Amino acid sequence: MKAVILAGGLGTRISEETHLKPKPMIEIGGKPILWHIMKLYSAHGVHDFVICCGYKGYVIKEYFANYFLHMSDVTFDMGHNQMEVHQRKAEPWRVTLIDTGEETLTGGRLKRVADYVKNEEAFCFTYGDGVADIDITREIAFHRQHGKLATVTAVQPPGRYGALQMEGDKVAGFTEKPRGDGGLISVTRQGSALR
C-alpha cells in the first residue's frame, strides 16, 4: 500500500518558518514533520510514499537526496575527494517526489499523482503538516471492511482562545480553550485507487 502525502502548501499562518522551507519540513525534535508522518505510516507497514511537492519542493527533494548524510555519521577525505558513510541508518522507504505546482489545490494535487497509485487496490492520503496519534492499521482495515470509495479520519480541534461565560455585564466563569465549534477537520484519508 502507498501513502500520498500533500507537501506543497505555502504555510501562511507560520510564515516566519516557511519563508525558508515548506511547512512539512519544519522540524519537531530535530526531524521534519514529514519524517514523523512517514515514521507513523511505516510503523503500520506502509513504506511506499508519493509526496506531492509544490512550494519550495526542492527542499524536500534535497532532504531525501541527502538522507544518508542526514541520518549517518560520515568522514570526508577532502584531499582524495571521498566520503565514507558510517553506521548507515535508513528507513525501508520508497519515496516518489512529484512537483504538483505551487498554486494547485488538494484535488488537483491528487489528480497529478493519480498515475502513481492507479494500480493500487487502495491508498492512504494525508496532509504533510500535522502529526496525529492514529491507528493506521485499524483505519485501513475499517476501509477494507466497508468497501467504500473513501474513509476519512477526523478530529475536533480545540478552541484557540480561552472563553468567558457572561451573565449580563459580569464575568460568571472562564473556560481555558474549550473544544472547537463542533466542526471536524480531516486528519487522514484512505481511498480506493483513482481510475
Annotate the PLM regions.
Residues 57, 110, 171, 186-187:
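A general structural signal for well-ordered alpha-helical segments in protein cores
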Residues 167-183:
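Short, flexible, basic/aromatic active-site loop/helix in glycosyltransferases
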Residues 186-195:
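Conserved nucleotide-sugar donor-binding
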Residues 1-62:
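N-terminal glycine-rich phosphate-binding loop and ensuing alpha1 helix
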Residues 62-168:
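Conserved beta-loop-beta/alpha segment of the NTase-like Rossmann-fold superfamily
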Residues 18, 64, 175-178:
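Short, flexible helix/strand-to-coil boundary loops that buttress conserved ligand/catalytic motifs
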